Amino acid sequence: MSKVQEILEAVKGLTVLELSELVKAFEEEFGVSAAAPVAVAAAPGAAAAPAAPAAAEEEQTEFDVILTAVGDKKVNVIKVVREITGLGLKEAKDLVDGAPKPVKEKVSKEEAAAIKAKLTEAGATVEVK
């Protein structure tokens, strides 16, 4: 049995918690992030046709942040929308009242995640496309 097969057999016997610890140990030891390899590793298990759209999604560099619902903290959401977009009070209120509407379009993944976090913290429901 080759070393690779031995390691594979050992990994098969691990619990989910142990696998999580193994991933963290790899990240610390080699200074890498397991986020991308996990997404790539999931694609080969899919059928051949759906694998192509999955690859296209991974390569997506621009995202739209959509405000889908306001919740009961409308004033806080308006404040955050103004902060994010630079809109005036009336424009921000109109955007919030007209939900679902895009708050910001064609932003990076990191910026989209930050915007989503701010709006969610303010009480809004947000979708990133």
UniProtKB/Swiss-Prot annotation:
Which CDD domains does the UniProt record give? Ribosomal_L7_L12
Q: Would you kindly state one Gene Ontology biological process term found in this protein's UniProt entry?
A: translation
Kindly name one Pfam family recorded for this protein: Ribosomal_L12_N
Q: Which UniProt keywords apply?
A: Ribonucleoprotein, Ribosomal protein
- Gene3D superfamilies per UniProt: 3.30.1390.10, Single helix bin (1.20.5.710)
Residue ranges annotated as transmembrane are none
Record GO terms (molecular function): mRNA binding; structural constituent of ribosome
Signal peptide residues on this chain, from the entry's feature table: none
Would you tell me the Gene Ontology cellular component terms?
cytosolic large ribosomal subunit
Matching entries from InterPro entries are given as:
Ribosomal_bL12, Ribosomal_bL12_C, Ribosomal_bL12_C/ClpS-like, Ribosomal_bL12_oligo, Ribosomal_bL12_oligo_N_sf
Q: Which family does it belong to?
A: Belongs to the bacterial ribosomal protein bL12 family.
> What quaternary structure, including any partners, is listed in this protein's UniProt entry?
Homodimer. Part of the ribosomal stalk of the 50S ribosomal subunit. Forms a multimeric L10(L12)X complex, where L10 forms an elongated spine to which 2 to 4 L12 dimers bind in a sequential fashion. Binds GTP-bound translation factors.
Describe its function: Forms part of the ribosomal stalk which helps the ribosome interact with GTP-bound translation factors. Is thus essential for accurate translation.
PANTHER family named among the record's database cross-references: 39S RIBOSOMAL PROTEIN L12 (PTHR45987), LARGE RIBOSOMAL SUBUNIT PROTEIN BL12M (PTHR45987:SF4)
What is the designated name of this protein? Answer: Large ribosomal subunit protein bL12
The organism's taxonomy opens as: Bacteria, Bacillati, Bacillota, Clostridia, Eubacteriales
Q: Which gene encodes it?
A: rplL
